[in-house]
Regions:
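Zn-dependent metallo-beta-lactamase
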Residues: 1-33, 181-182, 201-202
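Short hydrophobic/charged patches on amphipathic alpha-helices used for structural packing
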Residues: 25, 46-49, 176
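Conserved beta-strand termini and adjacent loop/short-helix elements that scaffold enzyme active sites
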Residues: 12, 83, 109-113, 123-125, ...
Length: 203
């Protein structure tokens, strides 16, 4: 079920029944503990997690990446971190309804100054409703970037139509400065391929 990406980093995925797009989740390990990023629920998941490390927290990169996050955090009895509404959403009322509807009230809203598990740092992606997370040499994003045939792509390139390239250009303009600032060497994404190394050289 788990696919190794790099030392102390694994991923697993499942197909979205509506879009046909594969949704990927990541497990990060540090000192015998495990943090789950945008986890999708699957049979046998809890047992597999505990073989690798003691679950400590679930972190969502954006609110639409609900997947199994509220359920998994509740059933494992671990903390759930969700993006701070005021930092990533334009309509606070709708976002609060979203949180209520999907049972995320117990989630801790995080922002750029939050002390996340494993020393993970969060960076708001301008114009996008998500955070880029930094874990060691890796940047983690939900939707904004991913690999396609070994090359770096920016949302929605390679997933949804973008005939003029204006949308992917806007995403790259927002994310590239963060990649450069953090010096991230690899990319972990919620879709398509991860980029284990050479991220800076792809800019």
């Amino acid at each position: 079920m788990f696919e190794p990406v790099a030392k102390n980093i694994f991923r697993w995925g499942t197909i979205d029944g509506e879009s046909g797009i594969i949704m990927y989740s990541h497990l990060l390990l540090k000192e015998g503990k495990a943090v789950l990023i945008d986890p999708v629920a699957m049979p046998g998941l809890y047992k597999m997690i505990k073989v690798l490390g003691e679950p400590e927290a679930v972190i969502m990169t954006n609110h639409p990446h609900i997947r199994g996050s509220p359920l998994i955090s509740s059933q494992l009895g671990i903390l759930l971190y969700i993006p701070d509404i005021k930092e990533v959403e334009e309509d606070e009322a709708i976002s609060n309804m979203f949180i209520d509807l999907y049972n995320m009230k117990h989630g801790i809203q995080y922002g750029g100054s939050t002390n996340l598990p494993f020393g993970i740092k969060a960076y708001k992606i301008p114009g996008r409703h998500e955070f880029a997370l930094i874990f060691g040499d890796f940047m983690i994003v939900g939707d904004s970037a991913y690999g396609v045939n070994g090359k770096l792509n920016f949302y929605p390139s390679g997933i949804w139509p973008d005939e003029t390239g204006s949308k992917s250009n806007a995403t790259s303009d927002a994310l590239i400065p963060i990649i450069k600032k953090t010096g991230a060497k690899g990319l972990l994404s919620g879709h398509n391929e991860d980029i284990p190394s050479g991220l800076q050289e792809m800019l």
